[in-house]
Amino acid sequence: SKSFGTYFFDNIFLTPVSTDAGVVVPGAEFSFELWHSFTSPKQLTGVTQTGAYGIELSGVTSGSLASFESFDYKVSLNQANGPVDYTAAFDFGTGSAHSFNLKASMALVMPERVDWSTPPEISIQYLTEVIEAFDGTEQRTALRDTPRCSVSYMYSMTDEQQYRFDNKLATSAGTMLIPLWPLQCRLSHGVSAGDARINLAEVSAHLASSETILVSEHDRYEILSIESMAGLEVALTSPDKDDFSKSAIVVPLRIAYPADESNSTSLLRGFDQHTITFDLDETLIQKPALVDDFERLNARPIFPFRPDRSKDIATQYNRRREILDPLIGARSIYDRTKGAVKILGQTFTFFSEQERQRFEDFAELMNGAQGEFYIEGPGQAFEFSEDVVVPTYKFKIKSSGYTNFANSYSLATNIAIKLYNGATVYKTILNATTNSDGTETVTTKESTNNLKVSDIETIVPLYLARFDSDEFRYIFDTNEVSIITKNIRQLLYADPAIDSKGAVSI
């Protein structure tokens, strides 16, 4: 039988012997070590490489190798395409070769620039199961631990670009390396060949979380791997090989699959337009860390984004009813809840990537349609009819219909009093009564003191709400300006699973 010494001494070792890297990107590098345990130096006569197209091996390939000394080797995937099955066999003249094997699948690079005349889109999809009780109470469960993401681009191709791109799409299979063009950044100054660091003029959160980037200028591009980032400085795993001016753009890259179906329109014999959707690989998601700096009320975030008033805000009133319709004769109608549920259709315009990223962070915090938050209504709640001089829990308002507060769950239980000095005061309404002079008296949970009508800009209702759907589709006019349209559903009942003890004092 073999002993440890029989195996260990007078032997040659490779660490590791093989690597299954899965999906890789151009420029990826893999390392291994070779050493031997012979008592005298060993002569390496050569290295035989198979499957080496576009692959470079760096390290000692011949000569005398000292005993018990580790020799480092690096395999660089520079120009490989498709499946990679690379073997490096080390020949020591003993009649048997010692081999290192690398298996991988190279993602196809899609560096072609998109046509911004059709705005590119980035869609983030969560998945929430909503179970609704008879009275409208909801139980919501997030079914994905990570959202899925897709991007949609239009490519306009002319002349030789046309048939090259068409042939590329028609013959490609497997994964692709897709730039997130709307999230591009710019260099603060040019880059020279051999530079191991690049400096950016600005950085998006998605680029900061990337492992691979594309540097593109006109029809030239280079794929670089990120070792680390410190502010606006990016350290590369290996120096770049080309020169780029300050006008070059830096784009985060993601591994994705093209959708099952894409379309092309031939406007001329030499002019095609391709519309393609790419689904990012959900197992290789690289997303920015969530930044939670949102103000809270009753342990729930307050929705901080203002809708674009240049676009109409639509409000839909949904009444929860059970209707028995015999088709002949009278119908039987039963109201499941008191009042209607409002669904607000709002469009939000972002004028910087930082603003849009904050909205994305809020959606992630809510886990799509699962979480609850407070949102301002599009109109006013009511108006004060007189000043508040001394501390009181009651104040008078103009006739508003809030006297139905006890009979309906639809009226907002919280309000935000916005003052001209920029301050916002939150109040919780307990009830409202009618006065003989036509005004109404509102009783609040919090005391109010020294509040003049002339100091109040507006009083808006704060509805408990959630996103009505799990899809967040951002449309980019430029890399800075983007919009999203969302329906936001009012909730009549708070989720008791959310601990209200964490509420801030108002």
Language model: regions and residue ranges:
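Short acidic/proline- and small/hydrophobic-mixed sequence motifs that coincide with surface turns
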Residues: 39-44
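Short, solvent-exposed loop/linker segments at beta-strand-coil boundaries, enriched for Pro/Gly
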Residues: 48-65
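Serine/threonine-enriched low-complexity regions used as flexible
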Residues: 84-92, 178
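Beta-sheet-dominated interaction scaffolds and their linkers
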Residues: 2-38, 76-80
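Short, hydrophobic beta-strand segments
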Residues: 67-81, 86
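Short strand-edge motifs at loop-to-beta-strand transitions and within beta-strands
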Residues: 30, 69-73, 440
